[in-house]
Structure formats: structure tokens, C-alpha cells
Amino acid sequence: MSKDGPFRFGARGLWTSGQALLFLDPLGVWMGTPMNDTYVAVEALSEAAARKELARLSELLARANAEYHRDDAPSLSDADYDALKQRNAAIEARFPDLKRGDSPSDQVGAAPSDTFSKVTHAVRMLSLANAFSDEDIRDFDTRIRRFLGLAEDAPLAYTAEPKIDGLSLSLRYEHGTLVQAATRGDGAVGENVTANARTIDDIPHRLDGAPEVLEVRGEVYMSHADFAELNARQAETGGKTFANPRNAAAGSLRQLDAEITRARPLKFFAYAWGEISAPLAETQTETLARFREFGFTINPLTVRCETPEDMLAQYRAIEAQRATLGYDIDGVVYKLDDLDLQRRLGFRSTTPRWAIAHKFPAELAWTRLEAIDIQVGRTGALSPVARLAPVTVGGVVVSNATLHNEDYIQGRDNTGAPIRWGTDIRVGDWVQVYRAGDVIPKIRDVDLSRRPEGAAPFDFPTTCPECGSDAPREPGDAVRRCSGGLICPAQAVEKLKHFVSRGALDIDGLGAKQVEQFYRDGWIAEPADIFTLRARFGQGLQQLKNREGWGDKSAENLFRAIDTARTAPFAKVLFGLGIRHIGESASSLLANHYLTMEALLAAVDAAVDETSDAWADLLNIDGVGEVMARALVTTLTQEAERASVNRLLAQIDPAPATPPQVGDSPVAGKTLVFTGTLETMSRAEAKATAEALGAKVAGSVSAKTDLLIAGPGAGSKATKAEALGIEVIDEDAWRVLAGLA
């Protein structure tokens, strides 16, 4: 029997006794085939495991975004999607150096379909950060006060409104006339659905007294009653029925024939705006009142709140009415009411700092723990997985849950403190499974009253189940790790898989499965081997062609993809090397600084001396800290690793990085340092302002620094800047330079 238990896996998923069941991998997401790794809690992830998890989350979220925003056919529940996003964000927060260039944190929606013409949004349609607890909301208020430099007792009002589960739409009015309607798309480019939007009764065609340009944004949705009636009508006529009101609304709005949309009972709530030529009001509340005057429908549950406790009270009031509203909502959105403060707070890459979505909780379920399996990850971590009797949690059938590590099974956390009141987990137990706050299904509780007689404590292995090597647990480490290294089949192939992954060289036709097969056959052992396949096996690579599913065309396509990858961007090659602490974001930073691999390697060689200018230059790159720099230097100067890199460079010619374009502000392209106490803005606001103007903000003064902004108490940084001949200005001069005064 395999470690997957008495199940077999087919193209449609997990099968047993002739019945198809939904299989979820350790991420809790439908994958079709079992994954080889199990995942630990974010706080227990190693660097390598975190890198691998971020790659997998990126792929899963990209697929989910396309299904939801473009195809109107999501396979994940909202709770599962939110949990994926939250886990991704939590890993990035713990390992900022690993943030990928295609990070889901920087993505909004999905690329628009080719079915409709494209519309570039004048102001991006961003998503919202999520909150899942009362404490998250209090922290949200605290962050805003800290950013704005406001006292804890300073008045600060918010609006609270239901989060409608529909399709986001932007309506552009020019001289009061509706001229364009566009979906969110990927946030920057959406789909032109103007003709269809004109058929929705809640959307005015003309606005009296509106500014010359006004983009009104809101949500298209369908009521429960209208959804039921539509599905009944569709079933009678043999048409497509919809899984839920959100899918029905999205599918109805995105019809090629506007008359079909006209026949669908769509509704629209207005709640935001994009481009606007003149302000409508000074607050969010007053702006919504103006929308109502224009003829838009505003959700009647929208209220103004004076404190976080008021916000939480409204959250509970809305949640209590959720079942009787007659339309789907999945949380409550809070927005800072003062529009001038919204402007000061600004935006992160994909979300505003002044708003947050407080999501409703996911479901819990009880089921029986049938087995505990041990899986070996990329770094050798031995991770336990709970095999469960299938149970529905949050709308998805769950059959696996993470058990994190041996401490978690024994009922204690990584510090030795008891969890679950110190109750251990045993095979045969009835356990409570949940998915809130993390994509991986977890076990919240154990029902000791139902524990089978004779259930034994779980004996965690001290040797690797894959290769038999010792699996010691180092002091301070939360997990046991296989000591077999590359002789362990569960670890050896992972570096190659990372090298060809989507964020790295992304070689079409050479995915994880193919890498595993080629490795087992002895065809590839390191990245350079990929680029010598044709030379070593000849034009035909007959061994490949003889395999099922391969032929002349597919083999040639693989060779062509490999040849294309020879000139992959320098940043992708660097990321593909899988250097600890060097994620996609860090790879891009390094590539933009050094431009070529040759220049990087020369700098690394010189930076071995940590008193050298090369070391200081490396640390001066904004976003590169000592841990990251030391890992880069140590890895690339290690003899075996450098030899492997040199063999790779003999086969490829990475495309040099292109220095990023900067704007025309006075500080664009310059490196700034802030020091001392700023009196008119917080340090975070100053940094955000400088970066928005195209400047780089460093944490320390060096020869590369162009300008030091010094407030009271500047200290040693100001002294060093003066010694280096760097221009030093005060906060007032900075505000003038930044156009704030």
C-alpha cells in the first residue's frame, strides 16, 4: 500500500470503491494528483520550504483568479481563496526576501478575456486587504493612526458597508453621460461591457450636476429570488444553469449579446469612484449621498462609525441579517471617512491603506482521523499529514489536514506551551477541522469522549521514510530533517524543479513531472544538464520520443523551449539558482543593480571582505539586508556551487537587466535617507511619498546616498552625510521638493 492509503489517483481525482471523491492536497486545494510535500505552519517554515510554498501558492492563486474574474467559474470557495491569499501574505511577511515577482500580493483580478475589447482604467481598480478577527480591525485602526501620526484618542471616523459578492464594475461618465463600462480585469485593464451595462435598471444613463469626468464604481449582483427564477427558466429551455448568484451575475454581464443581459435581472450597488475631475465631497459618507442624488442605489446598511468598537458592532449587526438580505455578502468593508486622510494614506501595490474587508468566518466540521502519514519536503523536513474521513468544510470536501510537526501532535507549541489544553492527537480520534485564516485544513480540537479504546500515542519517526537516513531535530528547530541530502530522492530533484518553475526559467514542456522522470533516468542532475540534452542525446532524443505522450513534435517543442530559455532575463536565472533568502523580489533588485551575472559574480567575489566597498554597495541596495547579502556571497563563492553556476553560464547567455525607468520629479532615481524626527508626517508616510516620486529610500548613509532629510535628533547619519559631502536638508525643504508645500 502506498503512503497515499488505499486510494488510487486518476485524471479526475481521488477514487475509491468506484466512487470519485474530491482530493485536496496538503494545501487543501484540488490538484488532481497527490503532492509530495506537506506543509507546516508559517511560523515553522524553513526558507526553502517557504520558497516552494510561495511558488505553489502563486500558481494556485493565478488559476483561481482566472476562474473567478475571467471565466466566471470558480472552483474555490471564497473562504478557501481568502485563506490562500492570507497564507501567501503571511509567508511573505515572515520571509520578505522570498517575495516573487509574480506575487499574488501584487496581483488584482485576472487578465481580461479576448472576447471583449480592452479598457485601460484611468485609476486602477484595486482589491482590499482582508481581516478575519476583531483584533485585526483594531490593528487596522492602530496602523492608520501610526501612519498619520494621530493620538490614540484623536477622532477618526470610518464607514462600514456590506461586502457584496458580485462582479466589480467601473462606469465612466463624461459631461454627465455614460460613455463606458468596464470590468475590473486585472485591475489595470478590464473588459468593455458598456452595451450590457446600459441594460441594468440601477445604472443611470445620465447624471445631472456631475463633474466633467466621473467614474462610479460598484458591484453588479443578482438577488437570491432572481437567481432561482433564472436557473429555473434556464433549465426549462435547456440553457446553462449557474452554480451561485455571483456566477450568474458575472456570466450575464459578460454576454456578447446585450439583449441576453437585458433579460437577466441584474442589480448594481455604487460604493466607490475612480477618475474624477472635481471632488464631490470631503468625506466618504457625503460622496455616497451625492451618488444617491445622481440616481444610484447605495446599500442601506452603510453607516458611519466613530470607533473600532462601533465598526465591530455593525459587523455583527450585518452578519445577523446575512441570511435574510436576499443577496450574497461575504463580509463588511470599512473605509476611512475623511477623503483628505485617504489621500495621505495612499496605496500599497494592490490595496489601499485606508480600507479593509472584514470577512465572515469559515466553517468547522468534525470527522475521524484515519491515519497519520509522514512526508518529506524539499529541505528534508519530516511533516505529518492527517488522513481524514472526507468531510465538507467551507463548501469543499477535505480529506487531509496538516499536523505541522511532532510537537503539535503531542499537544504543545514550538515553545513547549500546551495547545488544545495539552491534548495529543491519535489515529482514530474524532477531530474538529477548520480552514479559517489558513489555506491548509487544520485540526482545532479533539473529542476525547470519542477516543477509541486502545488508541496509542503517535510515535514520530526519527529516520527518513524515503531514504532511511537519520532525521535529527536540531536545537531550536520545530521539525525533524532528513540528513540524507541529495541521496534522498525526496530532496534531490527539488532544485531542478525550482529552476524550471514559472517564476524562474519557466521552460514549457519541462514541468515538475518531467523533471522527476529525467532525474530518475539520469538525464539531468543539475541546471546545466538541461541545456546539453540535445547535444548528449542527438537531434531525436529517441529515448524521449519512445515514451508515451512524446513524439517528434513534442520533443522538438521541448528543445525549442530550452533554447529560448538560454537567453532568459538575468533576474529569472538568478532566482532559478534557488539561493537561500534570494527570492524573486530580491533577484530583481540585484539584477537591476548589477545588470549582468558577470558583474554580480565579480561583486560577490569582492564582497567576501565585509569591510570592502563591494560589501557596502551590496548592503546599500534598498531591500537587501545582511542576511540576504551574506547568503548570496556565501553561496556563490562556495566552490561546488560556483562550479555549477559556471557550467550553467557556459550553456546560456542571460539577458542583461534594463535599469528601471524613473519619472521627472526632482528626486526620481535618487537615493534618499530619512533620519531624526519628522514633525509633519510619519516615517512610513515620508517613505511612501518618496517612492511614489521615483526615489529609492535607504536605511543607512553611504557614498551612494544622494540626499539626507534630517529632522531633530538626526545624530550620526547627519554627521556621516556631511563628511561624505552629501546634501542635507530639513523637513520643510523636503516638503517643498516633494510638492507638499
From Swiss-Prot:
For activity, the cofactor(s) needed are:
Mg(2+); Mn(2+)
Q: Where does Zn(2+) bind?
A: C464, C467, C482, C488
Keywords from the UniProt entry: DNA damage, DNA repair, DNA replication, Ligase, Magnesium, Manganese, Metal-binding, NAD, Zinc
What biological processes does GO assign it?
DNA repair; DNA replication
Q: Does the keyword Metal-binding apply?
A: yes
User: What span is annotated as the signal peptide, if there is one?
Assistant: none
What is the name listed in the Swiss-Prot or TrEMBL entry for this protein? DNA ligase
The record's NCBIfam families line, in alphabetical order, gives:
dnlj, PRK07956.1
Q: Which PROSITE patterns match?
A: BRCT, DNA_LIGASE_N1, DNA_LIGASE_N2
Q: Which GO terms describe its cellular component?
A: cytosol
Positions of the catalytic residues = K163 (n6-amp-lysine intermediate)
Q: Which reaction does it catalyse?
A: NAD(+) + (deoxyribonucleotide)n-3'-hydroxyl + 5'-phospho-(deoxyribonucleotide)m = (deoxyribonucleotide)n+m + AMP + beta-nicotinamide D-nucleotide
For whether the record's keyword set contains Cell division, the answer is no
The UniProt similarity line reads: Belongs to the NAD-dependent DNA ligase family. LigA subfamily.
Q: What is this protein's function per UniProt?
A: DNA ligase that catalyzes the formation of phosphodiester linkages between 5'-phosphoryl and 3'-hydroxyl groups in double-stranded DNA using NAD as a coenzyme and as the energy source for the reaction. It is essential for DNA replication and repair of damaged DNA.
Q: Which domain of life is it from?
A: Bacteria
Q: Name one Pfam family in it.
A: DNA_ligase_aden
Residue ranges of the BRCT domain? Answer: 662-741
User: What InterPro entries does the database record attribute to this sequence?
Assistant: BRCT_dom, BRCT_dom_sf, DisA/LigA_HHH, DNA_ligase, DNA_ligase_AS, DNA_ligase_CS, DNAligase_adenylation, DNAligase_N
> Which residues does the record give as NAD(+) binding sites?
D78, A79, D80, Y81, D82, S127, L128, E161, R184, E219, K335, K359
EC assignment? 6.5.1.2
Q: Check the record and name the SMART domains matching this protein.
A: BRCT (SM00292), LIGANc (SM00532)
Q: Which GO molecular function terms does the record list?
A: DNA ligase (NAD+) activity; metal ion binding
